[in-house]
Amino acid sequence: MISPLAYIHPEAKIGENVEIGPFVFIDKNVVIGDNNVIMPNVNILYGSRIGNGNRIFPGAVIGAIPQDLKFKGEETTAEVGDNNTIRENVTINRGTAAKGKTVVGNNNLLMENVHVAHDAIVGNGCIIGNSTK
């Protein structure tokens, strides 16, 4: 189900059986796989790639531009694999250099207020505790 209060850019690609809550913002150049739950007030921004079976809790921001003064608008991505739990207010920034990427693998738990910085790679099966930066 997609809430009528969500905004999904017409160029975004959304998979099958995706739940999208109210006040979610999904930007252009975003790909979201199947069987995801995206709860209210989540922002999935330009260049984000979300796999299958993820749960994204309220206030998460995925794909914001990197907090790096070297960034000049290059095409970069934030990539989230499959079966992750991304809790409240988690931020995952895009990569910095051209074709750079920030990656969160599969089967991870990112607890509340975690920040995954530009160009970071989180492997598979990780648990990252509250407010880790």
Language-model-detected regions and their locations in the chain:
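Structural signal for interior beta-strand "rungs" in well-ordered beta-sheet cores
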Residues: 2-133
